[in-house]
Amino acid sequence: MNIAVVGLSHKTAPVEIREKLSIPEPQTESAIAQLTSYPHIDEVAILSTCNRLEIYIVAGETDHGIREVTQFLSEHSKLPVHSLRQHLFVLLHEDAVMHIMRVAAGLDSLVLGEGQILAQVKNTHKLGQQYNGIKTILNRLFKQALTAGKRVRTETSIGTGAVSISSAAVELAQIKAENLAACRVTILGAGKMSRLLVQHLVSKGATQISIVNRSRERAQELAKQFSEHPIRTHLLPEMMTVIAESHLVFTSTSATEPILDRAKLEMVLAPNQPLMLFDISVPRNVHTDVNELANVQAFNVDDLKAVVAQNYESRRKMAQEAERLLEEEIEAFDIWWRSLETVSTISSLRSKIETIREQELEKALSRLGSEFGDKHQEVIEALTRGIVNKILHDPMVQLRAQQDVEARRRCMQTLQMLFNLDVGEQFS
């Protein structure tokens, strides 16, 4: 059995490709069901964010498992395999383990050290368990990755003052608009990213903010979190009217198709009316054809790289400190992983000795006859079970604790030969 990850990110694919492969949370259950239906995939977890899609698997035959994931991604995105491959990365076992640790710690993010990814990894773990994709191995891996991510944030300073996608978008808006206080700002959506947008806009001096959302309750709930600021809320049918009165529009909704395009804007904007759109959603909320309109500028998550680069160099040295912590968590997972290959030998040995115990106990009880009371039988049952457990305890502890791979394998082979054990598949 081996761990592998197949994926793409802001490093390997532009947003127009990433949005085709995005798996929104409502589609996670069916995606996991389809992936686990393939013959070579035993476990699966799906991490889908605006900047990455990564599918983690446990497979007996790694090459076959990777091919099955690639086929799934091709069908899901409706992109042929040959054009998809140029954007995909594939990492096997040690590299896959290192990767999820770095992802959880924010070291692989567009915004180095950003904190939102840890919550996204946690949600991936939760959904994987909920929909029966995650079992023993990925459960342990994701728990270790979450521990790594938390340690990096509490034991290093990399998360202090880290920019996020939302703050980078506001930073870009400030560069383009110069004076946010003079701008009428509209935010489409009322989720976590929108909350961060409001937070950063307010800190940069924005005072005229409107929130447009499908649910009035969610929009009002968000506005209440910033009750000291006069934030207006609107429902979706009012969206175009509100946009027509705006200077800046930020989009952060879960829509899977563009909700703004040239035709919609042409209907409400005056000729040559300036408007800047900042789309931090994947899939994108803003169609590329809006750039054909005079005085309309649209920016997406890939346009944030220049803003993020200013922050990167100062955080790179902090990342080196974080990498040392990750090595400790990787080693802890590796020790656990290597102990897995002892499981089949230990299980087989315990099963064989338990069978002998039961057979010999049955013989003894039959000789003692029916007059031998139940209470005495329970005592003898407990006695024999205790003897077996005590005899097996030290050999099993020593076998699991043996960190030298070759020495441990020699011990297992000796046990298998001496006790004539029939063991199943070994972990590699």
Swiss-Prot record:
Domain comment, as recorded: Possesses an unusual extended V-shaped dimeric structure with each monomer consisting of three distinct domains arranged along a curved 'spinal' alpha-helix. The N-terminal catalytic domain specifically recognizes the glutamate moiety of the substrate. The second domain is the NADPH-binding domain, and the third C-terminal domain is responsible for dimerization.
Source organism of this protein record: Trichormus variabilis (strain ATCC 29413 / PCC 7937) (Anabaena variabilis)
Family indicated by similarity: Belongs to the glutamyl-tRNA reductase family.
UniProt cross-references to PANTHER family, sorted A to Z: GLUTAMYL-TRNA REDUCTASE 1, CHLOROPLASTIC
Keywords associated with the record: Chlorophyll biosynthesis, NADP, Oxidoreductase, Porphyrin biosynthesis
Chain residues that bind NADP(+): G189, A190, G191, K192, M193, S194
Catalysed transformations (reactions): (S)-4-amino-5-oxopentanoate + tRNA(Glu) + NADP(+) = L-glutamyl-tRNA(Glu) + NADPH + H(+)
Name by which UniProt lists this protein: Glutamyl-tRNA reductase
Pfam family, one: GlutR_dimer
Disulfides per UniProt: none
Enzyme active site: C50
Gene (UniProt): hemA
Pathway of action: Porphyrin-containing compound metabolism; protoporphyrin-IX biosynthesis; 5-aminolevulinate from L-glutamyl-tRNA(Glu): step 1/2; Porphyrin-containing compound metabolism; chlorophyll biosynthesis
